[in-house]
């Protein structure tokens, strides 16, 4: 195994561990030592990849953005905007059980980072911002002048259902909301 492959693997493990811990216990309470332990990386090696905790947080945000862009790219392969929007809604069901237990991984991170100052405070908005911009473009393709408002309503419905699923420890809230949102999308197209 080359040094580059080992480095990439350790870096990816650190990001994956941070994602999980940030979701389960929050960014601020999570220590770099906990991330290192979960990633099975010596604690001192964390600083080789990330000079500060903020750098690791930024890497987690970038990872979420990459996943979002990949998901949206897959949805763009569908033939028209309504199925794409419904696909976005259904895609969130993949995290329904997780959301019921710990809240939405993306929504929770965005809410927590929003309380930070500077670049880190703005970083969380990038994740949901990309998804909202994409949804707005889909509604525009449906000929809707209120596309921005509709995109916000869609994301509010998705994120709101994740919050309620967590509050009531009931993943079915998200699946019921997804069905409602799909009917709503049909009524708009």
Describe the residue ranges of each PLM region.
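Helix-turn-helix
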Residues: 2, 13, 17-55, 59
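Alpha-helical structural signal
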Residues: 11, 15, 43, 57, ...
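Hydrophobic alpha-helical connector segments
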Residues: 59, 73-102, 151-154
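N-terminal intrinsically disordered/low-complexity leader segments
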Residues: 1-9
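Hydrophobic/aromatic-rich alpha-helical bundle segments in the mid-to-C-terminal region
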Residues: 106, 118-130, 140-189
């Amino acid at each position: 195994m080359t040094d580059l492959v080992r480095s990439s693997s350790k870096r990816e493990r650190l990001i994956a561990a941070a994602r999980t811990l940030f979701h389960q216990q929050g960014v601020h309470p999570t220590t770099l030592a906990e991330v290192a332990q979960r990633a099975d990386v010596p604690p001192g090696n964390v600083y080789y990849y990330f000079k500060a905790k903020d750098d690791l947080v930024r890497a987690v945000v970038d990872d979420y953005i990459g996943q979002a862009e990949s998901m949206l790219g897959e949805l763009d392969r569908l033939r028209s905007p309504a199925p794409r929007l419904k696909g976005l809604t259904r895609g969130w069901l993949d995290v329904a059980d997780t959301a019921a237990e710990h809240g939405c991984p993306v929504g929770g991170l965005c809410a927590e980072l929003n309380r930070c100052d500077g670049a880190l405070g703005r970083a969380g908005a990038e994740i949901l911002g990309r998804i909202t911009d994409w949804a707005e473009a889909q509604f525009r393709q449906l000929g809707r002048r209120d596309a921005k408002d509709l995109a916000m309503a869609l994301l509010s419905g998705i994120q709101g259902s994740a919050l309620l699923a967590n509050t009531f420890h009931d993943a079915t809230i998200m699946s019921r909301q997804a069905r409602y949102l799909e009917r709503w999308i049909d009524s708009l197209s």
